[in-house]
UniProtKB/Swiss-Prot annotation:
Gene3D superfamilies: Porin, LamB type. One of its GO terms (cellular component) is pore complex. The record marks Y30, Y65, W98, F250, W370, W427 as: Greasy slide, important in sugar transport. It catalyses: beta-maltose(in) = beta-maltose(out). Coiled coil: none annotated. It comes from Yersinia enterocolitica serotype O:8 / biotype 1B (strain NCTC 13174 / 8081). GO terms for biological process: monoatomic ion transport. The record marks Y142 as: Important in sugar transport. The keyword Lipid biosynthesis does not apply. This is Maltoporin.
């Protein structure tokens, strides 16, 4: 009987412990979804200039997308701790009630803080991770992003700044081959490793700081496998970024230079098996978000990127845009986004241009331009004139090369369109 009396107490204690542990799980993420129409008929179209690496996103997103993050501090003793972080991402076309998709397992890592006595404040980590990503939110453009499986040690306090070192990996389809038993065998995948060194928090002026980074990427073939003779093999990405606190927000000025394998994505990912990316890239970005007045906030971006490839298939991309926000109440606002992209083909010398305007009425959880969740209704107008595109004829020797006109290319020609709809966006 004594044992039976103790059993409910034990179960209650166990339930309490499990409940406490469950409550300690951190749930973070990002999501957006909505519905839209095109003025000429059909579902919402989205508009991106051929040759540009991004588009102005307000009222110009045509998919349902979500990142669901679960994490928990697994152990803590004094200032030492271990934290598990995971992230699964989904993307569907938002055409149907039931839309199945294969999720992307984006993150699964453990971060250990203050594990090295001689390096207080540092974090040791290993696993798949979004690693110190730098982006321009209004065009959804990640200009410094080496995310992937990896390991590193970050935030090493040097007194004048903080040092971080990491190694990450991604892969390319095919890319290398070998002769085995007198037969050619092509690899299904060839991995690329990236080695990253960053020095951040260098104070330059009141409210201002510098960050420098060096990324070296190279293709890493299996034993007995080799790359094509003219493959780029490796490359570097150099980054300098100045961040200035100003007008209730911030401004970031970025200069980047990349070579060879690091010029395909221009973000820190390497494609060393490619024979088409020998050359260099120069990029300059100025972007930020500021408070203009009591009822006015604004995001802005100006970007220049010149990719000069030996095969003359590079581009010069200019982009400039603003997104002012007028706050009628602490939870209701009107936004206007105006953006212009222009991309010149290195091969043809012609240009593709597009300007896009979006007017949105928004209800959001707060009075900042960053406040989310938000529900918005929008109308978008886009006008484009494209003189060139990339050859998209299967098995053509010129497939993937820039050429004039719309026949046999992905050029959109010259046209304009109107779309309208509603969308929610949230992060937490």
């Amino acid at each position: 009987m004594t044992t039976l009396r103790k059993l409910p107490i034990a179960l209650a204690v166990a339930a309490g412990v499990l409940s406490t542990q469950a409550m300690a799980v951190d749930f973070h993420g990002y999501a957006r979804s909505g519905i839209g129409w095109t003025g000429s008929g059909g579902e919402q179209q989205c508009f991106k200039t051929t040759g540009a690496q991004s588009k102005y996103r307000l009222g110009n997103e045509c998919e349902t997308y979500a990142e669901l993050k679960l994490g928990q501090e697994l152990w803590k003793e004094g200032d030492k701790s271990f934290y598990l972080d995971t992230n699964v991402a989904y993307s569907v076309s938002q055409r149907d009630d039931w839309e199945s998709t294969d999720p992307a397992f984006r993150e699964a890592n453990v971060q250990g803080k203050n594990l090295i006595e001689s390096l207080p404040g540092s974090t040791m980590w290993a696993g798949k991770r979004f690693y110190q990503r730098h982006d321009v939110h209004m065009i959804d453009f990640y200009y410094w992003d080496i995310s992937g499986p990896g390991a590193g040690l970050e935030a090493i306090d040097l007194g004048f700044g903080k040092l971080s070192v990491a190694a990450t990996r991604n892969s390319e389809a095919g890319g290398s081959s070998a002769w085995i038993n007198n037969q050619r065998k092509d690899a299904d995948k060839t991995i690329n490793d990236v080695y990253d060194i960053r020095l951040a928090g260098l104070e330059t002026n009141p409210g201002g700081s510098l960050e420098f980074g060096v990324d070296y990427g190279r293709a890493n073939t299996q034993d007995d496998y080799s790359l094509a003779p003219n493959a780029s093999k490796d490359g570097v990405l150099l980054t300098a970024e100045h961040t200035q606190s100003m007008m209730g927000g911030f401004n970031k000025f970025v200069v980047q230079y990349a070579t060879d394998s690091m010029t395909s994505w221009n973000s820190g990912h390497s494609q060393g098996t490619s024979v088409n990316n020998n050359g260099h890239m120069l990029r300059v970005i100025d972007h930020g978000a500021i408070n203009l007045a009591e009822k006015w906030d604004m995001m802005y971006v100006a970007l220049y990127q010149d990719t000069d490839w030996d095969n003359n298939n590079g581009t010069t991309w200019y982009s400039v845009g603003v997104r002012p926000m007028y706050k009628w109440t602490p939870i209701m606002s009107t936004l206007l986004e105006a953006g212009y992209d222009n991309v010149k083909s290195q091969r043809t010398g012609d240009r593709n241009g597009q300007y896009k305007l979006t007017l949105a009425q928004q209800w959001q959880a707060g009075d900042s331009i960053w406040s989310r969740p938000a529900i918005r209704v929008f109308a978008t107008y886009a006008n484009w004139d494209e003189k060139w595109g990339y050859n998209n004829v299967d098995k053509s020797p010129d497939n993937g090369l820039a050429q004039n006109g719309t026949i046999g290319t992905d050029s959109r020609g010259k046209s304009n369109e109107v779309t309208f709809g509603a969308q929610f966006e949230a992060w937490w």
